[in-house]
């Protein structure tokens, strides 16, 4: 087994040992959810947020914004736009449940962190056509952070203290890993919301300087 496969196996064991409820469940870590299904019942959702998800076991089909995606264990899906979606956990059963985890992303945090990237990287990625929804293969570092969030399910009292740092690191890894080429164009400086966030960031950095 590869390192990634070993990590996925560990994450499955950790998640099942926490015995998450059936369906989509919130956790003490803000924005972090568990997904456990034992049937193929299709579900619709419109979360109004951008998010990243990883499948630990099973296969999932997703229809988002008129586009169809299919991805399985060891793959992730990043949705950079708040769009209605319909998904189905394929072949899920009590014996072989579908398991995945997801994290709602904070656009302001992404924009703030993107400002620390080399300008050359930002310009190169900005030339790519925006793609708000895409499947990708996670890095070991990214899976490690998600495993840390899963382990917090056993110590929920520590989630308010530890989860924010882990979640911020996940945002950083998404901007620096294989997702960067598609994620960064969605954060272009021309976006109105980005302008506001950048203005706030400038004020924070320069509040003590004379006008």
Task: Describe the residue ranges of each PLM region.
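A short, N-terminal "cap"/entry segment at the start of jelly-roll beta-barrel domains
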Residues: 1-28, 33-34, 41-42, 126-130, ...
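N-terminal regulatory/effector-sensing and dimerization cores
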Residues: 24-122
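Alpha-helix N-cap/helix-initiation sites
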Residues: 45, 159-164
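A short secondary-structure junction signal
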Residues: 113-116, 147, 161
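A short, Lys/Arg-enriched amphipathic alpha-helix from helix-turn-helix/homeodomain DNA-binding modules
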Residues: 135-154, 163-167, 171-175, 179-211
């Amino acid at each position: 087994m590869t390192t990634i496969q070993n990590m996925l196996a560990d994450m499955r064991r950790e998640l099942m040992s926490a015995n998450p409820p059936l369906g989509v469940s919130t956790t003490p870590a803000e924005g972090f959810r568990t997904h456990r299904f034992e049937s193929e019942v299709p579900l619709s959702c419109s979360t109004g947020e951008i998010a990243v998800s990883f499948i630990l076991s099973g296969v999932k089909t997703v229809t988002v914004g008129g586009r169809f995606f299919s991805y399985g264990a060891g793959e992730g899906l990043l949705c950079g736009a708040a769009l209605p979606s319909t998904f189905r956990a394929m072949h899920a059963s009590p014996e072989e449940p579908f398991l995945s985890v997801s994290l709602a992303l904070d656009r302001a945090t992404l924009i703030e962190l993107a400002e620390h990237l080399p300008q050359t990287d930002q310009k190169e990625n900005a030339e790519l056509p925006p793609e708000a929804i895409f499947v990708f293969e996670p890095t070991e570092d990214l899976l490690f952070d998600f495993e840390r969030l899963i382990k917090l399910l056993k110590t929920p009292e520590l989630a308010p203290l530890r989860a924010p740092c882990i979640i911020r690191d996940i945002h950083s890894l998404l901007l620096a890993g294989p997702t960067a080429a598609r994620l960064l164009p969605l954060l272009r400086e021309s976006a109105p919301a980005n302008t506001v966030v950048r203005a706030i960031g400038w004020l924070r950095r320069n509040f003590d300087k004379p006008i």
